[in-house]
A protein has these predicted regions:
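Active-site/ligand-binding surface loops and adjacent short beta/alpha elements
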Residues: 4, 158, 166-242
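Short Pro/Gly-enriched beta-strand edge/turn motifs at strand-loop
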Residues: 22, 57-64, 88-92, 116-121, ...
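Beta-strand-rich N-terminal accessory domains
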Residues: 1-86, 224-245, 288-301
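Extended, loop-rich substrate-binding clefts of extracytoplasmic carbohydrate-active enzymes
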Residues: 1-4, 84, 90-141
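Active-site pocket scaffolds in enzymes
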Residues: 4, 235-304
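Hydrophobic residues positioned within well-ordered beta-strands of beta-sheet architectures
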Residues: 10, 28, 116-118, 133-135, ...
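Acidic, contiguous internal or C-terminal segments within carbohydrate-active enzymes
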Residues: 32, 120-170
Length: 304
């Protein structure tokens, strides 16, 4: 059976004043399906996000998408909550990756020239607690602001949310990345966190903004202070977030650079259920809201 065609894309664009942050205009594209995903961001005439490999690709390795109602890996695609055991569909071996929404179609509630709002019901997506997730993406001449919220339904729920951008690697040279964190999470070989922290080492220490070189990172940085700063030969990108975002996953395969701000750790529902403290997992009371915002602000080297 063939899948239905994707919903029409939303196109955002903002004119850039001459001599300020770059030529022409800033353009963004949002695909309601799959995943309510930011699928393109053109700054200074250059595409800054890894593109969709093909029209049928509904995987995680392109664009920028929201992770909810959990982030990263969920061990064995299951967790216990208030005396009950809940299971979900595995999509990475025996584990469940990046929540329930990155491959589903979102409903568009507003589409203007510089702002888009989308939402999706969690119940039909397979979340037994119900609720709704909303996101707003707002574009300006020198920034993109994304706000997301999870609103509980009639039941309290465990939740976390985060963003998973795939930034392109520059063809002009190496990139540097600053993350203000002294610790990462220890993981098993399959990258499931053990719940223990470990100090950064020569490979994972990004506090001074080193060149990435050939580092192949896939690490969760905790208690992150200050912005994340990605510097490429032709663009400086400063990533900030609200105070409830203190975890960043950094993934640097050859195909792109992922800088993922999150309200909680990967596998937070499982770890919190084992008594691990500091996971960032939030209990959302009935009809209450978990909300967070991240902002990407850019400038061009040599321009004021």
């Amino acid at each position: 059976m063939t899948e239905p065609p994707d919903a029409p894309a939303i196109h955002l664009h903002v004119a850039v004043p001459a001599g300020s942050s770059g030529p022409g205009e800033v353009r963004a594209r949002i695909d309601p399906s799959p995943g309510g995903r930011l699928s393109s961001l053109v700054i200074g005439g250059v595409e800054r996000l890894v593109g969709r490999p093909n029209e049928g690709d509904r995987t995680v390795r392109w664009g920028s998408f929201l992770m909810a109602p959990w982030v990263g890996r969920l061990e064995h695609a299951a967790f216990d909550w208030e005396g009950r055991h809940y299971t979900f569909g595995a999509n990475l071996g025996e584990h469940a990756l990046h929540g329930l929404l990155f491959y589903r179609e979102w409903s568009v509630t507003e589409a203007g020239p510089a702002v888009a709002r989308l939402e999706i019901e969690l119940g039909p997506a397979g979340w037994p607690f119900g609720g709704v997730v909303r996101q707003e993406i707002r574009l300006s001449a020198d920034a993109l602001e994304s706000t997301a919220e999870i609103e509980a339904g009639d039941l309290a729920m465990p939740a976390s949310l985060g963003w998973h951008p795939w930034f392109t690697r520059s063809s002009l040279g190496d990139s540097s990345l600053r993350i203000g964190s002294a610790e990462t999470l220890e993981t098993e070989p399959d990258l499931i966190p053990t719940g223990r922290r470990q100090p950064v080492d020569a490979e994972t220490d990004l506090r001074d903004g080193p060149l990435l070189g050939d580092r192949l990172l896939d690490h969760t940085y905790v208690d992150v202070a200050g912005p994340a700063i990605l510097e490429q030969p032709d663009l400086r990108l400063v990533i900030t977030a609200t105070d409830n975002v203190a975890t960043y996953v950094i993934h640097t395969p050859p195909s792109g650079i992922c800088v993922e701000p999150q309200t909680g750790w990967p596998d937070a529902p499982v770890l919190a259920g084992r008594g691990v403290a500091g996971t960032g997992l939030v209990r959302i009371e009935p009809h209450a809201i978990l909300r967070a915002t991240t902002t990407w602000r850019w400038s061009f080297p040599g321009r004021r």
